[in-house]
């Protein structure tokens, strides 16, 4: 087993605090402080010469949007931005693999894009009918994601 890098550990700690906020009634978490911690680990793409920095940056941007949503209460707007970031990450991977820009038609026909959109719609359908915080549903969703163990671009997720 490999040791988790400090930035990875910080990222996962912040994400775990979000899950805690969603599932533990009256959890007291300083998300402004967590946002500051996240900002410290955002990679500078100019410091790297490999594709992996792009999805890492996207993941930090998405988590940052999530933290802003919690802080400001702008969940719908931020959820749309996070959805677009995630889809953009998949598009970037496909274009990097093809070593060219792909048209919208080409992207829409790719299995990876279909899978990403299917997953996003599945999550949306599960959550849209919730009138209040459904802790069991949230925990079930979290467990399903953890069990999958693979990111939207095929990277193994360390637990």
Name what the model sees in each region.
Residues 1-105, 109, 113:
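Structured binding/interaction patches within domain cores
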Residues 88-159:
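C-terminal auxiliary extensions adjacent to catalytic cores
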């Amino acid at each position: 087993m490999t040791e988790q890098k400090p930035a990875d550990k910080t990222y996962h700690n912040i994400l775990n605090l979000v899950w805690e906020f969603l599932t533990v009634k009256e959890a007291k978490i300083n998300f402004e402080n967590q946002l500051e911690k996240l900002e410290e680990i955002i990679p500078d793409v100019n410091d790297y010469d490999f594709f992996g920095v792009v999805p890492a940056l996207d993941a930090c941007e998405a988590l940052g949007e999530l933290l802003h949503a919690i802080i400001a209460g702008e969940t719908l707007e931020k959820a749309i931005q996070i959805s677009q970031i995630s889809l953009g990450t998949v598009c970037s991977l496909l274009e990097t693999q093809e070593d060219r820009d792909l048209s919208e038609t080409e992207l829409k026909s790719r299995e990876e894009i279909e899978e990403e959109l299917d997953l996003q719609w599945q999550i949306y359908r599960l959550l849209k009918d919730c009138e209040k915080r459904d802790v069991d549903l949230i925990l079930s969703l979290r467990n399903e994601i953890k069990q999958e163990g693979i990111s939207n671009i095929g990277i193994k997720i360390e637990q």
